[in-house]
Amino acid sequence: MFLNDLYKIVELSSTAERIAATISLNPEHMIFEGHFPGSPVTPGVVQLQIVKELLEKQLGRSLRMKTMRTCKFIQILNPRETPELNIHIKFTQSEFLEITAFGMHQGNTFFKAQIAYI
């Protein structure tokens, strides 16, 4: 896991085309010492890395991003205010692994993305 102890998987389920995970963020992780001191924010690139790591774990293979069709960071993800995040991933395999993913907690959506991986 690239992100070491930044998060842990609390719950993980999948079907042939979907992954649902609940993760617990570690607000004491060193990444938040610089982003930002006293007011931690989970960087958008880190949120996308978590999606990639969940996919790799479930599919049992390494992935590399090919294209990102859309990506929106809708709300700030402060790990102290929102220690758990539900991540939903829908995917189809064609020439590339096409995914639609979003992260939410208690009805609040934090990010949405459409990505193709190889």
Region spans (language model):
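A structural detector for beta-sheet-dominated domains
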Residues: 13, 24-26, 74, 90, ...
